[in-house]
Amino acid sequence: MPKDIEIKVLIKRTNIDVKLAEKLVNVANEVRSNYMSGMLSKSVSTRETLACAELVVDGFSILDAVDFVISNKYINNNYNSEYSDVKKLIVGF
């Protein structure tokens, strides 16, 4: 989904602030890019960015919301290095 459309979806469905929606989509797109290049084994869906946005609207920080919804997908014996990689991406935003 194009970035601007995903941002609009987040805003419409959750009433999240525009700047926060942009940050969430930027993080998601960075993870998606790493998935497409083979650096990660899983991608991020719009449903997951919506879940992050809902948590942010409910009072979570972006960092905590993305960590809870996205980073935790990579916690597994096989993906611990991916978890670390995703955490680094998140902290960069």
Task: Please state what every model-predicted region is.
Residues 1-93:
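C-terminal regulatory/interaction module of P-loop NTP-utilizing enzymes
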